[in-house]
Amino acid sequence: MKLLTSLFLLSLVLCVNSQGWLRDSLDFLNQARLGAGDMWRAYRDMREANFKNSDKYFHARGNYDAAKRGPGGVWAAEVLSDAREFLQGGSSGRGVEDSMADQEANRWGRSGKDPNRYRPKGLDPKY
């Protein structure tokens, strides 16, 4: 009887302590969704701006905006950035050095540092 009571109390404590897992999971997924949207917006803006030497700025800005969403946004930014660089591979014609520079801009933005470090002079202020 004591064993049964102990197991019941232990499971009750574990259940009470785990009540936040669903909310935390849903928050993470929402942050990831919004972060992916931030990444898409930066990509769309980069294509629209079509401004020479601005890609690093948009990499940093997309990652920065996504990371502000929280851990889910950071995760989405990292996954999308890594996937883009992996899929693009050498097809951009710019080589490994450019890919490494893109990843540095990605990390800079994800770490919460100002993406304007990479902003080229003359880029339209709307970006």
Curated annotation (Swiss-Prot):
UniProt-annotated stretches for the region Disordered: 89-127
PROSITE patterns xrefs: SAA
PTM sites of type Pyrrolidone carboxylic acid: Q19
The keyword Secreted belongs to this UniProt entry's keyword annotation: yes
GO biological process: acute-phase response
Keyword DNA-binding: no
Organ and tissue specificity: Expressed by the liver; secreted in plasma.
InterPro entries from the UniProt entry: Serum_amyloid_A, Synovial_Prolif_Regulator
GO cellular component: high-density lipoprotein particle
Annotated SMART domains: SAA
Compartment(s) of residence: Secreted
N-terminal signal peptide: 1-18
Source organism superkingdom: Eukaryota
Compositionally biased intervals (Basic and acidic residues): 104-127
Keywords: Acute phase, HDL, Pyrrolidone carboxylic acid, Secreted, Signal
Similarity field: Belongs to the SAA family.
Protein function: Major acute phase reactant. Apolipoprotein of the HDL complex.
UniProt name for this protein: Serum amyloid A protein
